[in-house]
Amino acid sequence: MKVAVIGGGPSGLVTLKYLLAAHHFQPVDPIEVQLFESEDRVGGTFSYRTYDRAELVSSAQLTTFSDYRWHDKSVDYLSAVEYVEYLEGYCDRFGLRPHIRLSTQVEKVERTGKGKHRITVSHKGQTSTWDCDAVAVCSGLHVKPNIPSIPGLDRVPVVFHSSEYKHVRQLGQNTNVMVLGTGETGMDIAYFSVTADSTKSTTVCHRNGFVIGPKRLPETKLFGRVTSKTPGKALPVDLSRPYLFVNSYVHRKVRGALQTTLSRWAVKAGSWLVTGTTRGFDQWVGSLPKDKYDESHYFYCKSTKAMPYISAPYRSHSWVHRLRSSIVQAVLPDTGSRKIDLAPWPEYIDEDGVVHFEKNSRPDSKVLLQERRFKPDVLVLATGYTQSFPFLGSEYCTPDQADQRGIWRTGDASVGYIGFVRPSFGAIPPLAEMQVQVWVLNLINRLPGPLVADDSYRLFSNPSGRIEYGVDHDMFAHRLALDIGSAPSFFQALAHGWQVIVFWAMGGTLNTKFRLVGPWAWSGAPRIIHDELLDTVTGRRSTIDLLVALCIRIFQATSVVSSRPSKGDSEVTENRG
């Protein structure tokens, strides 16, 4: 079998690795694979669309692949530079480089008959073709910048997309900076702007609200005393959901919509407890409207550094807030006199370069209009990316048409889309690893059986929403593990010792857990759990962390009991040990 992989980012590299390794785990002949990457090095967006001081918002423990870990176990979040270094090491560790063709642009993918495909590529002006049996599209979500249509955009002296941002120097001297977009990159750039001595003002524009979620469990003060066991090293949020009740033993009637809704209620309650607002973490302004508080709009922004500068003018000073904060309060930075103005989306920019904003009744809109007319000197478009597959013919489906776990379309498993789902809290690379495990087994006819119809891992989709590929990270990873029989049961985990069973039950949904059993079982998985991952359960949870986790577990356990199935119902758990 011959397989082409398009794209040399994390999803492409992990796809290449599993294709090359398949014959070591399954009784099949070696697969011939070529990976085509248009740039001159691997890493994808992390190599070419990142910036100074950029840091991943998903933890190193979650983001790194199951069988190759970051060398420094004390690091929770990798910089973009470190992550590219990690991916380079991944290539070396598994001997991927001989199968990677860099600086090679895929021009066309077409069918040749009998289920095969022809890849046309160009390299240094030379065009060539390669015929294969299957194609893995791993070109990623962040390639073609999305440029909004705003009349008069060219009347701002400096305008560029966030994909071009590299350093705070680009924001200029004594400038009024405007950032369009409230995703992680937009918030990062706003933070760099407001804390730079060179800029005069910073304004962030949003379309219709956003939700801030911390990437670490917040450090808190209880009656004025910091409760964290390790100040500055609070547990990453994406490691904090216990696998036992989040996935393994949650009744089918509680899974999906109800489970996600209840979890979000708990998050909102926790946010109020430590910051005084339910809109988001320390988010006193810019919230989503009530009719938009559904999962299709509810992708957290996990860059929190800018929010204190946005919230400063809006924080409550009521006696209730003062009383609450005197008892328990998240540790927040002192912003001094610096602030970030929040504004509605620009409607147009007039001949004088003055921005005219869309009119609404939001508090931030009223404050901005009262203060001044705004004339930006620098405008950064942190407006995301659009999906584009110019190399695919019309006979091929697109990721949104891939109805089998977002990987392939029914009846056409020879074309797989890896890494095109977006988790609300989580990371794309580990989900790509789980997706490719399923896809490769299907290619070689080694899937245990047909995929069970199950959409409980999907975030609700709103017909008017822009994002249609959202998933709950933990539930999706677990579903993929169930598909291939790699979700370990209690007794299968217990067979590896008490450390493994503790992490299996109370640790996060990390892919190494799914290498204990199943078609991709790996003997090194228990060692990684013991040496690295167990610490996320036993080493860094404060008193408040444990109390909150205990409440959630009691609630989830109660949900299981109250939803106990009738006799003969075999789906309380899908783990078969």
From Swiss-Prot:
Its cofactor is FAD. Keywords: FAD, Flavoprotein, Monooxygenase, NADP, Oxidoreductase. Pathway: Secondary metabolite biosynthesis. It is an enzyme of class 1 (oxidoreductase). This is Monooxygenase PC-14. The keyword Hydrolase does not apply. Its EC number is 1.-.-.-. Gene3D superfamilies: FAD/NAD(P)-binding domain (3.50.50.60). SUPFAM superfamilies: FAD/NAD(P)-binding domain. PANTHER family: DIMETHYLANILINE MONOOXYGENASE (PTHR23023). The keyword Nucleus does not apply. InterPro entries: FAD/NAD-bd_sf (IPR036188), Flavin_mOase (IPR000960), Flavin_mOase-like (IPR020946), FMO-like (IPR050346). Belongs to the FMO family. It holds the Pfam family FMO-like. GO terms for molecular function: flavin adenine dinucleotide binding; N,N-dimethylaniline monooxygenase activity; NADP binding. Monooxygenase; part of the gene cluster that mediates the biosynthesis of the indole diterpenes penitrems. The geranylgeranyl diphosphate (GGPP) synthase penG catalyzes the first step in penitrem biosynthesis via conversion of farnesyl pyrophosphate and isopentyl pyrophosphate into geranylgeranyl pyrophosphate (GGPP). Condensation of indole-3-glycerol phosphate with GGPP by the prenyl transferase penC then forms 3-geranylgeranylindole (3-GGI).
